[in-house]
C-alpha cells in the first residue's frame, strides 16, 4: 500500500480540521512549491525528514536490452533524496517483511 496525496489531504481534513477542498489545495500547493524550487535549481530541505537535491549525470554508454545495440544515454539532471537522521531512526528498527 502507498501513501497518496489524497491520503494526505484526508489526514489534514481529519486532524487539522481543514475543509476537504482546502486540505486538497494545501497538499497540491505544498508539492507545487517543492517542484518549483527543484526546477529553479534550489535544494529542498525538510527539517526532520530529509533533503531533495538535483544531481547532474553525464552522458554514458548504454545498451538496448532487446537488441544488444550500444546506445548513448544522454546527460541529464536527476532528483535525489537523502533522508534525515530523524527519519532514518524511525525506520531503521522496523521489522523486515519477507
From Swiss-Prot:
PANTHER family: DNA-BINDING PROTEIN HU (PTHR33175), INTEGRATION HOST FACTOR SUBUNIT ALPHA (PTHR33175:SF2). Residues 53-69 have a biased composition (Basic and acidic residues). Residues 53-73 are annotated as: Disordered. InterPro entries: Hist_DNA-bd, Histone-like_DNA-bd_CS, IHF-like_DNA-bd_dom_sf, IHF_alpha. GO terms for molecular function: DNA binding; structural constituent of chromatin. Belongs to the bacterial histone-like protein family. Keywords: DNA recombination, DNA-binding, Transcription, Transcription regulation, Translation regulation. NCBIfam families: himA, PRK00285.1. This protein is one of the two subunits of integration host factor, a specific DNA-binding protein that functions in genetic recombination as well as in transcriptional and translational control. Heterodimer of an alpha and a beta chain. One of its GO terms (biological process) is DNA recombination. Pfam families: Bac_DNA_binding. The keyword Transcription applies. One of its GO terms (cellular component) is cytosol. SUPFAM superfamilies: IHF-like DNA-binding proteins (SSF47729). It comes from Aliivibrio salmonicida (strain LFI1238) (Vibrio salmonicida (strain LFI1238)). The gene is ihfA. This is Integration host factor subunit alpha.
